[in-house]
């Protein structure tokens, strides 16, 4: 993917979208996340990088309570995530998530996949939900696929449907968990281009990815994780050109060719 200077978009200096304070998570005796502290401002675009098993996907899954943290605090759009199911639902309504695997319903058409949540969760009338869905399918450049089923689409097209489906809920924050890692190389660019478009419109984004060209182009900040900890974070130019931590230097030397 061709690299370009990051566009100077408005990032709120005062409005916090996500705040994580001393967050820890265990799987049994395994300490998967250690004392995570992170503040994401409205409109900020953050790329989270790191080796497999570093905890990066687990961290963003905690942001919409797909994973439960055992210690510390997570506040999303002013709501603290606890065991309160009502608060969890409040957060999930405002946070879209796109996964490595598309998670589309195979027995529903593309249009039906996109209208399901707005109709059932937002209580949107069907006609309005279909209009919203077509708007976002046009935005990700696949409106002609609306009446097809997921199995009739390429992997790149299915991932763009997954992005459109999330946008139909009008989220304030988008989380991406390695959205291109399951795609064939020739399909990666079409998905990244869609994500670049979202970033250019000012969407608050946290993205776990190994696509470092995307990080250079889009991110306000790149975070490097290893062994369940945030090891280093900086603006893209400083992160890539002058990494401070030896573990970051080693990772970049292995991933950048």
From Swiss-Prot:
<dbReference type="GO" id="GO:0015424">
    <property type="term" value="F:ABC-type amino acid transporter activity"/>
</dbReference>
<comment type="similarity">
    <text>Belongs to the ABC transporter superfamily.</text>
</comment>
<dbReference type="Pfam" id="PF00005">
    <property type="entry name" value="ABC_tran"/>
</dbReference>
<dbReference type="GO" id="GO:0016887">
    <property type="term" value="F:ATP hydrolysis activity"/>
</dbReference>
<keyword id="KW-0547">Nucleotide-binding</keyword>
<keyword id="KW-0029">Amino-acid transport</keyword>
<protein>
    <recommendedName>
        <fullName>General L-amino acid transport ATP-binding protein AapP</fullName>
    </recommendedName>
</protein>
<feature type="domain" description="ABC transporter">
    <location>
        <begin position="18"/>
        <end position="252"/>
    </location>
</feature>
<dbReference type="InterPro" id="IPR050086">
    <property type="entry name" value="MetN_ABC_transporter-like"/>
</dbReference>
<dbReference type="InterPro" id="IPR003593">
    <property type="entry name" value="AAA+_ATPase"/>
</dbReference>
<dbReference type="InterPro" id="IPR017871">
    <property type="entry name" value="ABC_transporter-like_CS"/>
</dbReference>
<dbReference type="InterPro" id="IPR003439">
    <property type="entry name" value="ABC_transporter-like_ATP-bd"/>
</dbReference>
<feature type="binding site">
    <location>
        <begin position="50"/>
        <end position="57"/>
    </location>
    <ligand>
        <name>ATP</name>
    </ligand>
</feature>
<dbReference type="GO" id="GO:0005524">
    <property type="term" value="F:ATP binding"/>
</dbReference>
<dbReference type="InterPro" id="IPR030679">
    <property type="entry name" value="ABC_ATPase_HisP-typ"/>
</dbReference>
<keyword id="KW-0813">Transport</keyword>
<keyword id="KW-0067">ATP-binding</keyword>
<dbReference type="InterPro" id="IPR027417">
    <property type="entry name" value="P-loop_NTPase"/>
</dbReference>
<comment type="function">
    <text>Part of a binding-protein-dependent transport system for L-amino acids, affects the uptake as well as the efflux of these amino acids. Probably responsible for energy coupling to the transport system.</text>
</comment>
């Amino acid at each position: 993917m061709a690299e370009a200077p990051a566009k100077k978009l408005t990032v709120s200096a005062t409005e916090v979208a996500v705040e994580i304070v001393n967050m820890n998570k265990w799987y049994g005796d395994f300490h998967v996340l250690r004392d995570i502290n992170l503040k994401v401002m409205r409109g900020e675009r953050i790329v989270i990088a790191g080796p497999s098993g570093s905890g990066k996907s687990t961290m963003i899954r905690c942001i919409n309570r797909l994973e439960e943290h055992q210690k510390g605090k997570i506040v999303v759009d002013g709501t603290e995530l606890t065991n309160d199911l009502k608060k969890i639902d409040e957060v999930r309504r405002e946070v879209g998530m796109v996964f490595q695997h598309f998670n589309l319903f195979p027995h529903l058409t593309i249009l039906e996949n996109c209208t399901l949540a707005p109709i059932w969760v937002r209580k949107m009338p069907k006609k309005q939900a279909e209009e919203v869905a077509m708007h976002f399918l046009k935005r990700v450049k696949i409106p002609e696929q609306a009446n097809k089923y997921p199995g009739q689409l390429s992997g790149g097209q299915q991932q763009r449907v997954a992005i459109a489906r999330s946008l139909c809920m009008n989220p304030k924050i988008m989380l991406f968990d390695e959205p291109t890692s399951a795609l064939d190389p020739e399909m990666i660019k079409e998905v990244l281009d869609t994500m670049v478009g979202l970033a250019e419109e000012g969407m608050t984004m946290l993205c776990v990815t190994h696509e470092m060209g995307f990080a250079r182009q889009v991110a306000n900040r790149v975070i490097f994780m290893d062994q369940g900890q945030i090891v280093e974070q900086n603006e893209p130019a400083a992160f890539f050109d002058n990494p401070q931590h030896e573990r970051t230097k080693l990772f970049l030397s292995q991933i950048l060719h």
